[in-house]
């Protein structure tokens, strides 16, 4: 019997990850514009998070405004990463720190200089950067002026942002993720934080008004933007490597009833598999097309989009894991919360004080 390894193999990239909107703070420093994350008020166990397009720090607490103050303490933080033995650090670049409104033609040099210093510090400790281009940091102006990712113009704005980074860091960064947890838009909670969609003035983050046509239009535009970014990046540096990034919530049928088993299969396909299939294989899978048809979901696919998806596939598959869910057709089944989405309560698992089940 082969013994379990007691150490990582040579070249294994062990490390950690952050999102710019969660750690940087300095939300309006050195020319940075507000992002959609900057408009989200903190919640409590009793009160859900809210979205406020008018940012008022005198009345509300916005977590992204301070984060962990990585903007001013990146040197100490990266030194700690090195002390932990990090070989890779996954980070995102805050879009409105580079293009404050998202629609400018010239980038904010002060923002770029900050990331210059971060990459130099990582190099000092031999830590490989893995850069996420979009981690729920769309410039707030693009949300209010365009309606977020539903508008096709967002693709060009994103590509302008991506090109600046690809050219500036073509000899610094090898690994790129165009979109964090791109499959978030297969759920209603993804409307705001991933799509920049504010349906009918939705303010309650946990109970957003959902328009599936808009949501899947935004997701399609992100698929196209990702494919275009991959193709552009490979022109700039053929050694670049791009990956999909999926929020994978493992699902189990609550019972052996055929209805529960079938519903679990469908949930797994749509939430966990579809987005990875599009980005890795370059086509919408048959089950996605069937889902759109059965649920009367319509969005525009422009001439050339399908060819772009075929050509702009990614090189690697990455995912995040939070917890599992159970799925059932029973309407009265006990429910639990979770990150991004909840589900039916698994009677065999314990739960945190936030009602996330532990497994």
What is the predicted function of each stretch?
Residues 2-58, 82, 101-103, 109-359:
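Active-site region of glycoside hydrolase catalytic domains
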Residues 11-13, 71, 88:
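A common structural microfeature
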Residues 17-19, 92-96:
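Acidic/polar N-terminal loop/beta-strand segments that form early-domain functional surfaces
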Residues 59-73, 150-153:
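Active-site mouth loops of central-metabolism enzymes
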Residues 66-79, 100-101, 111:
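Internal amphipathic alpha-helical repeat/solenoid segments
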Residues 87, 96-98, 136-138:
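A short acidic, glycine/proline-enriched capping/turn motif at secondary-structure boundaries
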